[in-house]
């Protein structure tokens, strides 16, 4: 693929894609994070300060605020940098960002991994089932595979509703899936924005009209609407991926405890779905409070991740 096969969006938090500079962006998670004013100090000396890069994707918002809640309880000062995908990798490689929690491998961020992978620390994968999808409402009983779209363009108005034009999801759909299934001359891939795609999807569902959209898992909309991903017998949308956490050079040396916790960090699809629903769906504008609420509802979770280091952490109040 020619670029990272991913996309930006922010549902229910009201934001646009962040700019291509390490500046605060317009995403709901950003309201609680500051901007780092200098290098973070490690666990062994001075104040414990850490800067986490945040892309406005649901799973990243959810897990970033999860760790913000935990680390603040452990005495860290947590700064959140709202960034786009290219600068989050460059910033981590350069040491301006300490931690980024949403690296999709091997395909979605493959281009960036080829460029920066030897300049950052891979801290491990926390989810193994991430995927890119073409998706329709479940009431479309006669469309179950991408193959079923062929010959039905009139039904869909000749459109596949996509997201941002530079996104990897759009590129995968346009460069791989549409040619593989012979849809190029029959359908137009509409490129707009993720919020616009979601609005069209919800409008179509209210009216029970046909629609096919580009989507991805994990995503909060699967918990909100009755959807089905189209089968992809040719594998054009790519194989399932792993979501990794990465750290700046020297991260494990400077933050040995945190590196161990991050290495133990795992979330199932069910867990990330419930975390997203709480953090984004129920606590818009107060995402860290949402993370605390989720931790209060899952009191044993941190014991699995942090072991004895979880003692004394109480989010029930």
Question: Which residue stretches match the model-derived regions?
Answer:
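Ligand-binding cleft/hinge of the Venus flytrap
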Residues: 67-74, 155-187
């Amino acid at each position: 693929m020619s670029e990272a096969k991913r996309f930006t969006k922010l549902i229910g938090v009201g934001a646009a894609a962040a700019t291509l500079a390490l500046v605060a962006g317009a995403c709901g998670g950003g309201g609680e994070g500051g901007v780092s004013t200098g290098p973070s100090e490690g666990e062994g000396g001075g104040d414990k300060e850490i800067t986490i890069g945040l892309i406005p994707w649901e799973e990243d918002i959810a897990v970033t605020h999860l760790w913000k809640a935990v680390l603040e309880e452990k005495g860290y000062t947590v700064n959140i940098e709202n960034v786009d995908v290219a600068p989050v990798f460059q910033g981590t490689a350069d040491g301006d960002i300490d931690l980024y929690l949403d690296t999709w491998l091997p395909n979605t961020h493959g281009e960036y991994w080829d460029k920066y992978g030897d300049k950052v620390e891979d801290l491990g994968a926390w989810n193994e089932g991430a995927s890119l999808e073409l998706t329709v409402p479940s009431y479309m009983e006669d469309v179950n595979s991408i193959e079923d779209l062929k010959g039905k363009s009139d039904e869909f108005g000749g459109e596949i509703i996509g997201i941002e034009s530079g996104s990897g999801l759009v590129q995968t759909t346009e460069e791989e899936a549409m040619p593989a299934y012979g849809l190029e001359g029959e359908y137009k891939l509409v490129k707009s924005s993720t919020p616009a795609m979601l609005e069209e999807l919800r409008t179509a569902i209210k009216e029970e009209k046909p629609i096919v959209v580009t989507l991805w898992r994990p995503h909060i909309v699967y918990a909100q609407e009755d959807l089905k991903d189209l089968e992809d017998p040719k594998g054009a949308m790519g194989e399932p991926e792993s979501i990794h956490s990465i750290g700046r050079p020297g991260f494990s040396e400077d933050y040995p405890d945190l590196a161990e916790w991050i290495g133990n960090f795992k979330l199932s699809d069910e867990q990330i779905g419930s975390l997203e629903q709480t953090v984004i769906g129920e606590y818009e504008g107060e995402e860290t409070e949402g993370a605390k609420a989720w931790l209060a509802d899952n009191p044993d979770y941190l014991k699995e991740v942090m072991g004895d280091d979880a003692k004394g952490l109480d989010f029930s109040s």
